[in-house]
Amino acid sequence: MAERKYFGTDGVRGKVGQFPITPDFALKLGWAAGKILATQGTKQVLIGKDTRISGYMLESALEAGLAAAGLSAAFVGPMPTPAIAYLTRTFRAEAGIVISASHNPYYDNGIKFFSSVGEKLPDEVEEAIEALLDQPMDCVESAQLGKAMRINDAAGRYIEFCKGTFPANASLKGYKIVVDCANGATYHIAPNVMRELGAEVIEIGTKPDGLNINEKCGATDIKALQKVVVESGADVGLAYDGDGDRIMMVDHLGNKVDGDQILFIIAREALRSGKLHGGVVGTLMSNMGLEVALKHLAIPFTRANVGDRYVLEQLKEKGWKLGGENSGHIIVLDKNTTGDGIIASLEVLAAMEAHKMSLNDLARAVPLFPQVLINVRFEGGKNPLESDAVKAVAADVEKRLAGRGRILLRKSGTEPLIRVMVECEDGALAQSCAEEIVEAVKSN
């Protein structure tokens, strides 16, 4: 694969107003994508966004670029990332474009693409788009220019899709649910899904103003959700991130239920119903407690590199259907083609309803191991992880933790940092082992 100049692992992302998140680059990107995507099909591209104020600027620029290349744009407004994947498929569009920086602050934004089947664009297509970005723009004949339209019922379509994944003979009547939408793209979707399934819903983080996305709310900051759940006597709390592809949950006692626990609950329920389709894909950061709990059920488990993109790659490689990250990216491939926070939360709620069990009871089946994370800054160009002394200490720690824990040492890709992670069923042992490795890293 050729080295990328503009596209990262999750499209193009950065600070608004600084290259590449500028209106002129978005215009050129729309044009380049349009030139590559133009086929004999409908020549239509869906464009969705989260609630950042910069989304207006970027969608207009993208639309102009697409039109110059002869493709029409269909705007769906603020919609979750997984909704764009779904709608791109159902509208038979050439592609879908999402304008979002996910869980980042409002002053960041990004642009990523879905293929016509709602999956990440193939590498060769991204490379072809990149190659065109360095060429001068041209414009199709006036009669061939693209148009723009707005799809007014996109939210309703996606709400119905989400509800359709919930068991037809079940409902959420009698449940009190607090829904935190991070002032992001799920603000007009998730509360309505839960209400229409019968739940009593308390909303927080559903008043976006363009600047407050992910601000002290949502999947990356659940303190407000925990407080409201406990004070209101709710059964469960749901926290989505800015673009709706992550989910964190809170039980009735205010305890956090993370992606690893959510993944286990969904896997166990799929096993019981005969719909597991193989095993489960986690990541290098998935808690060992998840691995142990799945092993007790004889469910195969494998680890991908950190990032939902790599989880998806492993799922496809193995032909499995379920994977995710402890950060709350949960992929259920027989429901949607990408991580979907609303779908994942409905899977857990369906398990709660089927067994008349609280989230606390369901999550208790995954006793998470204490995890110690320490970042160690290093000087100079040499990677301390290549030191024989560090390797020897790491090997000794691994031997002591055998069967009871594990270590993960990673060099940051963006900073001169070594990330030391140790987890063990004995928290004190995890802490002492981590400190031992840190000292070795600092000394080399």
Curated annotation (Swiss-Prot):
Which leading EC class covers this enzyme?
isomerase
The Swiss-Prot or TrEMBL record lists the needed cofactor(s) as: Mg(2+)
Entry binding sites for Mg(2+) = S102, D241, D243, D245
Presence of keyword Metal-binding: yes
Instruction: Give the sites modified to Phosphoserine.
Output: S102
What stretch or stretches form a coiled coil here? none
The terms describing its cellular component in GO are: cytosol
In the record's cofactor note, how is the cofactor described as bound? Binds 1 Mg(2+) ion per subunit.
Keywords assigned by UniProt, alphabetized: Isomerase, Magnesium, Metal-binding, Phosphoprotein
Q: Which reaction does it catalyse?
A: alpha-D-glucosamine 1-phosphate = D-glucosamine 6-phosphate
Q: How is it modified after translation?
A: Activated by phosphorylation.
Which Pfam families is this protein grouped with?
A: PGM_PMM_I, PGM_PMM_II, PGM_PMM_III, PGM_PMM_IV
Instruction: Give the family from UniProt.
Output: Belongs to the phosphohexose mutase family.
What role does this protein play?
Answer: Catalyzes the conversion of glucosamine-6-phosphate to glucosamine-1-phosphate.
- Which domain of life does this protein belong to? Bacteria
EC number(s) for this protein? 5.4.2.10
Gene Ontology molecular functions: magnesium ion binding; phosphoglucosamine mutase activity; phosphomannomutase activity
Look up the record and give one Gene Ontology term from the biological process aspect: peptidoglycan biosynthetic process
Q: Which organism is it from?
A: Actinobacillus pleuropneumoniae serotype 7 (strain AP76)
Q: So where's the catalytic machinery, residue-wise?
A: S102 (phosphoserine intermediate)
Task: State the protein's name.
Answer: Phosphoglucosamine mutase
Q: Which Gene3D superfamilies does the entry mention?
A: Alpha-D-Glucose-1,6-Bisphosphate, subunit A, domain 3 (3.40.120.10), Alpha-D-phosphohexomutase, C-terminal domain (3.30.310.50)
